[in-house]
Amino acid sequence: IEQTKFPGKIISENIKQFDPRQVSSIDDFIVEEIQGQQGTINAVDYPSIMIVVQGDGLMNQGKTSFQPANVFLIDKQTTIDFQANSNLLAYRAYSVLL
């Protein structure tokens, strides 16, 4: 087990990325912390899983609702917009190995 030893990198207004490949021997995956009242979750080249920790609201122009403990499987190259009633806190992870 390795505790995160780095602060992460802010890649957008709502997303902080934790890429262990920069400081660790772990090179299998990247984790992103998503926060905010509204915003966009950028597409990545890999399928991903996102877990909502807090907040509720709508995604994809109101087509999908979210609330704490929801788990979403996201296809590669999928951009998600969100509008939260209270601040969203979610984590997305994806493997960078093919």
Question: Where do the model's predicted regions map?
Answer:
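Short acidic-glycine-tyrosine-enriched beta hairpin
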Residues: I34, L58-D81
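C-terminal amphipathic alpha-helical segment
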Residues: I1-Q38
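Generic structural motif
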Residues: V31, G57-M59, A90
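A generic structural signal for well-ordered coil/turn residues at beta-strand boundaries
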Residues: D28-I30, D45-Y46, P68
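Extended recognition/assembly regions associated with phosphoester-bond processing machinery
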Residues: G36, V71, Y94-L98
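Ligand-binding loop in jelly-roll beta-barrel domains
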Residues: S65, K76-L98
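C-terminal functional regions that serve as terminal interaction/effector modules
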Residues: M50-I51, V71-L73, L88-L89
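Glycine- and acidic-residue-biased ligand/ion/polar-headgroup-sensing regions
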Residues: G36-G62
